[in-house]
From Swiss-Prot:
Annotated Gene Ontology cellular component terms: plasma membrane
The encoding gene: CALHM2
Highest taxon of the lineage: Eukaryota
Positions of region (Intersubunit interaction): 214-251
The protein's name in its UniProt record: Calcium homeostasis modulator protein 2
Length: 323
């Protein structure tokens, strides 16, 4: 049963790795929507106090969005490739345009969750109403022939998000809520439209500027996914066998289960890779060609024995970043 569950998880992992990044972004967005709903129900409580409402409302929208953005940057492998590039090569082998494109890719992916959070917050309107209720102009509030009392208007308006205030002003409370939710939802829909246009233009520009055909880009994406999967799996086995060998040398024996015994017997490990090899396969990578043949990754480049960035006429570097 455990093996079946593990196999199913492996299949799902391979499925999502083989598909377009839009699937992953969709899952991130759905998870963010659920988190936002839970936050609104459990944790959001407007203080309904002048000066505090504004800070609390902005914090309810901005702080989780900022946290989600930073988490997205941290979890993106391209971030650490860029850091490694700066550390080992000082980005001297990459022009400004590729570095900017890679940074844009990192920011774009990391922005999925915070943008989703902001959009849902604006469409719901609670945080916006909480933040701006006290700033509604009391002179603009008219219901029939009744006008809103100006005395202590700020304090009364600040209490409206909590459903509080004088009973005879409940009709104004509904008007304030309706007006602010209209503004909040309008900003939310505008944000959706702006993001959709930016995504569309970015995708069009990426494919227009790409030197590769659509099929070769798809093949490159499949290669990267397969290389990463095989590298991680092999690194896990290599480190496990190496650890078993070192423990055996120290104690004279090593306690292995059946699976580990098969691994040690099947994959003998003689040594480790030097640091220079690890550095060679780590960092920012652009699509390159060597004598007309594509090099799809730093590992591919290292395996082919290509040294440097290939700036001779027989080498072609293309400023195309992975999706």
């Amino acid at each position: 049963m455990a093996a079946l569950i593990a196999e199913n998880f492996r299949f799902l992992s391979l499925f999502f790795k083989s598909k377009d990044v839009m699937i992953f972004n969709g899952l991130v967005a759905l998870g963010t929507v659920g988190s936002q709903e839970l936050f609104t129900v459990v944790a959001f409580h407007c203080p309904c106090s002048p000066a505090r409402n504004y800070l609390y409302g902005l914090a309810a929208i901005g702080v989780p969005a900022l946290a989600l953005f930073l988490i997205g940057v941290i979890l993106n492998n391209h971030t650490w490739n860029l850091v490694a590039e700066c550390q080992y090569r000082r980005t001297k082998n990459c022009s400004a345009a590729p570095n900017f494109l890679l940074l844009s890719s990192i920011v774009g992916r990391a922005a999925v969750a915070p943008v989703t959070w902001s959009v849902i917050s604006l469409l719901r309107g609670e945080a916006y109403v909480c933040a701006l209720s006290e700033f509604v102009n009391p002179h603009s509030l008219m219901v029939g022939e009744r006008s809103f009392p100006v005395a202590h208007a700020t304090e009364i308006l600040a209490r409206f998000p909590c459903g509080e205030g004088p009973a005879n002003l409940s009709v104004f409370r509904e008007e304030v809520s309706r007006r602010l939710k209209y503004e909040s939802q309008l900003f939310g829909w505008l944000l959706i439209g702006v993001v959709a246009i930016l995504v569309f233009l970015t995708k069009c520009l990426k494919h227009y500027c790409s030197p590769l055909s659509y099929r070769q880009e798809a093949y490159w994406a499949q290669y990267r996914a397969n290389e990463d999967q095989l590298f991680q799996r092999t690194a896990e086995v290599h480190s496990r066998v190496l650890a078993a060998n070192n423990v055996r040398r120290f104690f004279g024996f090593v306690a292995l289960d059946k699976d580990d015994e098969e691994l040690v017997a099947k994959f003998p490990v003689e040594g480790t890779q030097p640091r220079l090899q690890w550095n060679a396969i780590t960092g920012v990578y652009l699509y390159r060609e060597n004598q007309g043949l594509p090099l799809y990754s730093r590992l591919h480049k290292w395996a082919q024995g290509v040294v440097g960035n290939g700036m001779t006429p027989d080498h072609v570097e293309m400023s195309l970043l992975p999706s």
